Amino acid sequence: MRGAIRIVESGCLARPARAALGVGKFQLRHVIDSAVSAVFDVDLRDLRAPTRGSTRAAFARQVAMYLAHVVCGLSLTEVGALFARDRTTAAHACRLIEDRRDDPELDGRLEHLERAVACLFDALIARRG
């Protein structure tokens, strides 16, 4: 978690349509899952499970879908495919997370995650270039 905090404090800003910049879907999913897993203390296996799993794992997965859509600029269809879910499931996840941003604690976590995922992608893109 300390590493994620340092990344967040570096001040990287999210840019839309990161997926179009040549970062592979596997890398995209790995970066998002790793960040969400660390912040919400959910095992990666639970986050990637084909079934809904625990309430905690399902919520963390919804956050991951939200980040893929908002930070990485994926369409809801692409988010659904990335997480082996339907497009409507991805849409529901994004609406749910957006509605819950009124909670200051959750909103703070989401802001940190957005910056962290953006920074990690900046690093991946720089390495590829």
Where are these regions (language model features)?
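Short, Lys/Arg-enriched anionic-surface-contact patches
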Residues: 38-61
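Intrinsically disordered, low-complexity basic tails/linkers immediately adjacent to helix-turn-helix/homeobox/MYB/SANT
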Residues: 6, 14-18, 100-129
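Short alpha-helical "recognition helix" segments of helix-turn-helix
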Residues: 77-83
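Short, amphipathic alpha-helical "recognition" segments used to contact nucleic acids or chromatin
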Residues: 58-73
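DNA major-groove recognition helix of helix-turn-helix
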Residues: 69, 93-94, 98-101
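Helix-turn-helix DNA-binding elements, focusing on the entry/boundary residues of the two helices
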Residues: 33, 75-76
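Helix-turn-helix DNA-binding helix
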Residues: 89-91
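General nucleic-acid-binding
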Residues: 1-34, 128-129
